[in-house]
Regions:
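Alpha-helical substrate-binding/gating segment
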Residues: 213-223, 228-255
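NAD(P)H-binding glycine-rich loop region in Rossmannoid oxidoreductase-like domains
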Residues: 39-106
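N-terminal Rossmann NAD(P)H-binding glycine-rich loop of SDR-like oxidoreductase domains
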Residues: 4-30
Length: 279
């Protein structure tokens, strides 16, 4: 699927990862239908408008709500590819069902249900997570070679234990279930590890990944950072992976997207070296 004549839809287009996907699409000359909560909130979309001025593609904004049925119908019309990135990533929550599970699960249902109604849709690229594959290192003990692969599913997360991982697992399983019930569009899923890297909009840093870096720098972890290995990947590489998933005809199934393993301590040391503050 290499034609750039048809439109593409990006849900949650002003988000951390989604903004990089939109930028890539505009550079390549696509027309992007971008859904956001409020298309009239210029502060949230100004960086995307600046991309449109710089690159050869075009962008059209639509207001949409993950929890409202038919909310994506208008934005999806005449689109051949859907990038469904919109889903909450929060670690500090009070109500996991309302804040995480409902938006992730119902949002997936609503976007995919709209896709079933729109004849132009040929492929959906879903942003999932390695969190849909495992909760923590304890799960690896029961895996062959202690290895997580694209065949691995999270079996331990719940509403009360790692609800974010639970929300990603439920949403992705629902996506595959809906995919198997139809034959008009293909599904490719990207499962990144911890996504880090520059934020495309310097004035709007509302991302859990950015919050983590802030906490490392603002003294939140001054007593000590968690001794925990973690896989990380550059946000720009994840955006490129989404693009390849959409336009590479051989792309199918799930793709773990992770660059290397590190730790919070190593990330802290790297940040320290970049800002030139002595230890």
């Amino acid at each position: 699927m290499s034609s750039k004549q048809n439109n593409v839809l990006v849900t949650g287009a002003n988000g951390y990862l989604a903004s990089w996907i939109v930028k890539k699409l505009l550079i390549e000359g696509h027309t992007v239908h971008a859904t956001v909560r409020d298309k009239h909130n210029k502060e949230k979309i100004n960086h995307l408008l600046e991309y449109e001025k710089k690159y050869k593609g075009n962008i059209k904004f639509f207001s949409a709500d993950l929890l409202k049925k038919n909310s994506f119908d208008e934005a999806m019309r005449n689109c051949s590819i859907i990038f469904h990135t919109a889903s909450p990533f929060k670690l500090e929550i009070k109500d996991p069902v309302r804040e995480l599970i409902n938006p992730a699960l119902e949002g997936t249902k609503n976007v995919f249900t709209s896709a079933n109604k729109i004849d132009s849709v040929k492929k959906i690229v879903l942003t999932s997570s390695v969190a849909a594959m495992y909760t923590d290192a304890s799960e690896c003990k029961n895996l062959i070679n202690n290895e997580i692969t694209e065949l691995t599913w999270n079996k331990t997360a719940s509403i009360n234990y790692q609800p974010y991982s639970y929300s990603k697992t439920l949403a992705e399983k629902e996506a595959w279930s809906l995919y198997k019930k139809q034959s008009k569009w293909e599904l490719v899923v990207i499962n990144p590890s911890l996504v880090l890297g520059p934020f495309p909009n310097a004035t709007q840093t509302t991302s859990e990944s950015i919050n983590l870096l802030k906490q490392i720098g603002d003294g939140t972890f001054k007593i000590g950072v968690p001794k925990m290995p973690i896989g990380v990947v550059d946000v720009r590489d994840v955006a490129d992976a989404h693009y390849e998933a959409a336009f590479n005809k051989k792309a199918s199934g799930r793709y773990i997207t992770s660059a290397y393993n590190t730790s919070f301590l190593e990330i802290s040391k790297l940040l320290l070296s970049l800002i030139h503050i002595s230890e």
